[in-house]
Amino acid sequence: MEREIMARLAKWKDSPDRKPLLITGVRQCGKTYVIKEFGNRYFEDVAYFYFEGNKGLASIFDYDLEPERIIKELGSIVRGKEITPGKTLVIFDEIQACPKAITSLKYFYENLRELHIVCAGSLLGVSVKRDNVSFPVGKVNRMQMYPMTFPEFLCANGEQELYKGAGRFEPGKELPELYYVPLRKYLKYYYLKLRT
């Protein structure tokens, strides 16, 4: 399934000014899927860490916020496999569940810039205010992710040609039935999926 945000992620990966990336968006909009897919496509290895309900994982950030130590412990103790900057994509999922992990992003930016780190969070703004988290302003890149768009939905259902074909017609003009009928069917299905 191809999402439009994937191209932005690839651009972030190759940016000389890259900072740890924080992707926010509502629950169930596909953040985790997209980030894992991005890692599998563009990196030799993916190190995935899920913070929600995992106090042991969060405790790694209690001692200090030194990136080298954190990455070594995440790799050797939690994961059982070394994390290699430049080759491994590190994913912190539901990062809002570990306020110190959010704060640590500042130090990852300052002291371990060669590491590619992507974080995902839902209701992150609420969590930051509620828990009085020291947010690393200016030390992270941010992207907002939204639920799947109708064009993405068409492509995910194997209808790339229908999407391209309909796109050749001028907006506001009546579509030929050849396009209108299937597009209408998919639009109904799309709206039903959005509600579930």
Identify what each model region corresponds to:
Residues 91, 116-122, 144, 153:
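Structural recognition of the conserved hydrophobic beta-strand(s) that form the central parallel beta-sheet
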Residues 110-132:
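Sensor-1/coupling segment of RecA-like P-loop NTPase cores
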Residues 1-16:
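Pre-Walker A adenine-sensing motif
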Residues 128-196:
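Interdomain motor-coupling "hinge/lid" segment immediately C-terminal to the ATP-binding subdomain
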Residues 31:
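Conserved lysine of the Walker
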Residues 34, 38:
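Hydrophobic positions on the alpha1 helix immediately C-terminal to the Walker A/P-loop
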Residues 53-86:
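Short glycine-rich substrate-engagement loop in P-loop NTPases that contacts/grips substrate
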Residues 23:
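Hydrophobic anchor at the beta1->P-loop junction of P-loop NTPases
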